[in-house]
Amino acid sequence: MYQTINIFPTTIYVGELENHLQHKNKFYDVDSEFNYRNSQWDVTSENTFDSFIHLNQSLDSLFSEIVLHIKKYIFDVLEYKDIFDVVITKSWLSRARQAEDQIKWHNHSTSHISFSYYIDTPPNSHCIKFLNPHNFNSLFAGNNTSTIKSSIENYNEFNSSTFHINPKQGNIILFPSSLRHRTEKVSDSFKGERLAIIGDVILVLKENNLGYSQGYVNPKYWKLYS
């Protein structure tokens, strides 16, 4: 007789926006403001077109609902103290119009939490894949990287180096910004447009909780030097 204890998991939150169809229609009403068409920008608009979708006032209800999910993730799931305000610092589009429109491994180094809100996901849409940051259960170097022979009988949550989610429209996925991730095609027959709003979040200490050393202070206390 024995037991196994899984310690120190990486927690990803998957939710669904209740007012998705309303938010989707509102977004398409203003889509032309963010509709980049240059082929080199087809995968993401970050740093090339517009990274501040959250500042569009007509989308306030969308981002307010996103923030409700972020607070559930922080306070209900991860069980942090309610001493933080949520600040969205950047938001941009992720688009795939063909199977090869994939995003390479990366993380978001300037934020605490990142989110993906899926506006549209046609059949065979790209998945989002996450990389195991530690993989202590990999008993041999390169155990999860071989594409020819593997010593693992069945891949599961204990021995895998990657994990993927096939999101549906209306889903919101939240994860630590430091977690490496990518998008990956699931079929060469993908057609249509997979469209998601991606965003970065920092946690800012509330005015009555500035005595904590963890967390940013409100940007009103910052001073810009140039």
Name every feature range the model reports, one short phrase each:
Residues 87-95:
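A short glycine-rich, His/Asp/Glu-containing loop-to-beta-strand
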Residues 95-172, 193, 207-215:
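Catalytic core of non-heme Fe(II) oxygenases with the double-stranded beta-helix
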Residues 119, 179, 201-203:
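Short beta-strand segments enriched in hydrophobic/aromatic residues
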Residues 1-83, 92, 102, 193-226:
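Non-heme Fe(II)/2-oxoglutarate
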Residues 174-178:
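Short, proline-centered helix/strand-breaking motifs
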Residues 103-106, 181-189:
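Short beta-strand His + acidic residue motifs that chelate non-heme Fe in jelly-roll/DSBH
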Residues 16, 94, 116-118, 198-200:
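Residue-level recognition of well-ordered beta-strand positions that form the cores
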